Amino acid sequence: MQLPPSTASSETHLEYTSHFQGAGEAWKDAEIITTEQRAAIQEVSALVQARADALRARLSASEQAAEATSRARARFGVRDVVLDLRVMACSDGLLNGPAQRSRSHELYRSVMLGRTASEITETRPRQQPELVQRMRTQLADAPDFAAKAPLLADLDEALQKSFGARGALDDAEAAENQASDAEIAARLELRRTLEQAYGKLRAAFPGQRDFVESFFPRRKARRSGEEGEAEKKRNEG
């Protein structure tokens, strides 16, 4: 019996179960099979089918979770761009207002936390919302000027959406990890079931190794040219 490598994908494992089920269906229709043997084939086929169905469900859930994470990551990326724009707008509002075009102005340095706007926007996306939140607090405590209220409103909206998008991404990544773990567990359970099925078939059909082996696909042997190429790559590595 040959099972796929333990590191093989769920899709590869399911290909093995498709072969197993195809062989089972063919043997059940074979005229040389007795009623008792047909019942044994039916039993192991049902076991394998149940585990295969479970893995398919877990695989589907894992793929959906990965897609959800990708969408959540894209949304958070968009919110990072928007937050950057709000930071730049705040910097411009200060420079065109009370800071009088000077980044060395005390108010500018206070609101911008002693940084330039670019230094803030270049912060890692996951860390930036807290930094901008501190900046927003400094702006709120600053003396009033014409652009202060709209700048605060824009920062508040951008921060709220950035925090929300980051939280949604965290939730999506956690769900993806959970789905991936469940898929791996289902795949391992399917491998164990295939091994058990092999043992049950050997017990039900003693001395008929070829018959039992027909339920499992055989890995194709490499042609000599392929083997030579593989050896060449190993030597080059």
Regions found by a protein language model. Name each.
Residues M1-G237:
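Basic/polar low-complexity intrinsically disordered segments
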